[in-house]
Amino acid sequence: MYKIGDKLRPKARCFAAIVYIVTAKVYNDWYQETIYTIEQIGFGKHIIDGITEDALNKDYVKIK
């Protein structure tokens, strides 16, 4: 499990990376099964494609 932002950034500091988020943790026992794509470019700045604000507010994501 990776925290959004904290552990994704180091992979993107020197090069562009595409990360597939498989599962977003939602509330107690309910999970939203969705595939998201994050494109990260340079210095920890990310460009995000296909992710809603609601998904970004979740605490953890699983990266495949």
What is the predicted function of each stretch?
Residues 16-27:
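Short beta-strand-centered aromatic/proline hotspots
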Residues 29-38:
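Short, solvent-exposed secondary-structure boundary/capping segments
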Residues 37-64:
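Intrinsically disordered, low-complexity, charged/polar segments
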